A protein has these predicted regions:
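PRPP-associated nucleotide enzymes
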Residues: 1-319
Length: 319
């Protein structure tokens, strides 16, 4: 197995390599004065099973487009030089939210991204908590592996909320299935009933309204509010306010990907949110180190989940 980590922030790739018990394969990323890049492996990839890791969020120095282009060109280079199988490991998949047309002449960008991956000859792709699982799986014609973020959160919840009445909630109708899957898993883990709720949300012309409508009983419960990502934080805050208004004892906000754009740090410091828990799929570089939210933020590693998936994939390939 060859594991390449293209991210400038190497913390996730190093954690994944440690979980797998392998070293990161060496490569060169040469920057030219005109802004172009050249990426090449520094060891012979012929006949190897290669996994290329790149989380496609916009960083402090690289846009999602920069990262996407580098990832595609490097995977194509591996195929060019005889790599037996190349797999994309993409904890955060850019443009996954644009999976359908909502206005006249809209793009379906997720499908175009999938076509780019297929054009360079990848064998399969691993993604953490896609915005819409069905749309993600249907966009790609190669095998897809969807890793559910709630598996990373489960140990924390089972240890910290042993005696408390718990409910899982979705902040909008679109995330109901995601929240239901976690609820079903928690029932087995905790060995007792777990409540369920959903907060209404409607979006029109970029404006969001919810009217604080909550479906489900959360009175006196600790609510685990689960979404795929946190961008501006408005969806989480609106839902948390509605849940507290419906009698929730406390609301803990969980998301696979913490983008924290704009004034998200201030929004999420609302008293309705007790704690914010994310995975390490995206580095929380946008949060100032001395911001109050840092004290309420917990980052859980998704590396063990990816290691399990990659290990199984490699073992099957070797057979």
């Amino acid at each position: 197995m060859l594991l390449y980590g293209l991210d400038t922030d190497t913390s996730f790739s190093r954690a994944l390599a440690t979980e797998l018990g392998v070293g990161l394969a060496p490569f060169e990323n040469r920057h030219f004065e005109d802004g172009e890049h050249k990426l090449r492996p520094l060891s012979d990839p012929r006949g190897q099973d290669a996994y290329v890791l790149h989380s496609l969020y916009g960083g402090s120095s690289e846009s999602p487009h920069d990262k996407l282009c580098q990832l595609l060109m490097f995977m194509a280079t591996l195929r060019e030089h005889g790599c037996a199988r190349v797999s994309a490991v993409v904890p955060y998949l850019a443009y996954a939210r644009k999976d359908r047309q909502t206005k006249p002449f809209d793009p379906v960008t997720l499908r175009y991204i999938a076509q780019l991956f297929e054009a360079v000859g990848i064998a399969q792709i691993f993604v953490l908590e896609a915005h819409n699982v069905a749309a993600f799986q249907n966009a790609f014609r190669c095998p897809t592996f969807h890793i559910e973020a709630h598996s990373a959160f489960e140990a924390m919840v089972s240890e910290g909320l042993i005696e408390q009445a718990v409910a899982v909630a979705s902040p909008d109708p679109g995330g109901v299935k995601r929240a239901q899957l976690w609820r079903e898993s928690l029932v087995l883990t905790l060995g007792r009933p777990v409540g369920f709720a959903m907060v209404d949300k409607r979006r029109s012309a970029g404006l969001v309204s919810s009217d604080n409508l909550v479906a489900g009983d959360v009175n006196g419960m600790t609510v685990l509010l689960l979404d795929d990502l946190i961008a501006s934080g408005d969806t989480m805050r609106r839902a948390a306010v509605a849940l507290r208004g419906a009698g929730a004892r406390q609301v803990l906000a969980f998301a696979a990907h913490g983008l924290f754009v704009g004034s998200a740090a201030e929004v999420l410091c609302d008293e309705s949110i007790g704690q914010v828990i994310i995975t390490d799929s995206v580095s929380p570089f946008r949060l100032p180190t001395d911001h109050a939210l840092r004290k309420r933020l917990r980052v859980v590693s998704a590396a063990p989940l990816f290691a399990q998936a990659l290990r199984a994939s490699h073992a099957a390939w070797r057979r």
